[in-house]
Amino acid sequence: MSIDIQWNLLDEQIAEKLRAKLDTKIAKLSLPRYIQDLHITSFDFGTSVPDVTIQDICDPDPRLYEETLYSDDSSSLDDEESDREEENMTELPPYGATENGVHKKDSTDVNMNHTQTSNQQSPQNIAESNIHKSVPNSAETPSFLRNSIGDVQIIAHVQYSGNMTMSMEACLAVNYPSKDFAMLPFTLQLSDIVLDGTLVVALIASHVHVCFVDTLEHNRGDVQSSIIKNIRVDSVVGEPNKQVLKNVAKVEKFVVQKICQIVEDEFVWPSYFTLY
């Protein structure tokens, strides 16, 4: 079953909340010596609507109820999220991003497509194994975790290839002939973002939780992204009219890989993002 999405409801307030969450994680990164003050300046959902195919409608996962109760009773949701993320970090699959970059004059396309092996499960089976099998029967679920009328969880296959964009800024340090001899302003624009994955949306009381389910079978040394399939990178180093360097592939690769890693860590189950 396919549905129409009111994409315009993802307004500036939600975009800013997402930008702030990503920027908080960026600020905690260990940066190379030549990159300083890396931060996200803007995020825009764009106007292109993803293709969404509903795979299942069911009761929300009980663990989402636990978090909803904690967040309602807590004065600091961010602290609760941080605690949860640290506890769940060991549950996340190995991460990496394959970069088959096509370097053009002022841009880089980072393609993360993969070939699925015959023994891999379908997105539907993965979603069922990762979500449904973890949900106890109602008799096994404590009464305070049982869903109320109207609570629902939607599992859907989402394909997106649109005009979503994100802008970043940083300073590149020139350490020759001495340390920090010069600081060059660096701007980076991420666009042509392609997403393909199984999305879970849980509506619980007044809260909306979203996350992706990893549909890849990860092996040691696996360098594939389960969600992001492509990103175009446009970068400028130096003043716009006095460019010193172009296509700083090493910096672009680092930034894109870290962005993809954050997406995997923060938006792939058992981690999730609360829209409201």
Swiss-Prot record:
Among HAMAP family, the record links this protein to: Mdm12
What is this entry's stated membrane topology?
Peripheral membrane protein
Residue ranges spanning the membrane: these are none
> What's the record's remark on domains?
The SMP-LTD domain is a barrel-like domain that can bind various types of glycerophospholipids in its interior and mediate their transfer between two adjacent bilayers.
To which species is this protein native? Schizosaccharomyces japonicus (strain yFS275 / FY16936)
Protein origin, superkingdom: Eukaryota
Q: Which family does the record assign?
A: Belongs to the MDM12 family.
Q: Which GO terms describe its molecular function?
A: lipid binding
Domain SMP-LTD residue range list = 1-276
Any idea which UniProt keywords this protein has? Endoplasmic reticulum, Lipid transport, Lipid-binding, Membrane, Mitochondrion, Mitochondrion outer membrane, Transport
Q: Is-annotated flag, keyword Iron?
A: no
Which InterPro entries does this one have?
A: Mdm12, MMM1_dom, SMP_LBD
Region (Disordered), start-end ranges: 68-104
Functionally, this protein is described as follows: Component of the ERMES/MDM complex, which serves as a molecular tether to connect the endoplasmic reticulum (ER) and mitochondria. Components of this complex are involved in the control of mitochondrial shape and protein biogenesis, and function in nonvesicular lipid trafficking between the ER and mitochondria. Mdm12 is required for the interaction of the ER-resident membrane protein mmm1 and the outer mitochondrial membrane-resident beta-barrel protein mdm10.
Q: Report the subcellular localization.
A: Mitochondrion outer membrane; Endoplasmic reticulum membrane
**GO cellular component entries:** endoplasmic reticulum membrane; ERMES complex
Please give the subunit comment from the record.
Component of the ER-mitochondria encounter structure (ERMES) or MDM complex, composed of mmm1, mdm10, mdm12 and mdm34. A mmm1 homodimer associates with one molecule of mdm12 on each side in a pairwise head-to-tail manner, and the SMP-LTD domains of mmm1 and mdm12 generate a continuous hydrophobic tunnel for phospholipid trafficking.
Name by which UniProt lists this protein: Mitochondrial distribution and morphology protein 12
Q: Where is the composition biased (Acidic residues)?
A: 75-89
Alphabetically, which GO biological process terms does the record hold? mitochondrial genome maintenance; mitochondrion-endoplasmic reticulum membrane tethering; phospholipid transport; protein insertion into mitochondrial outer membrane
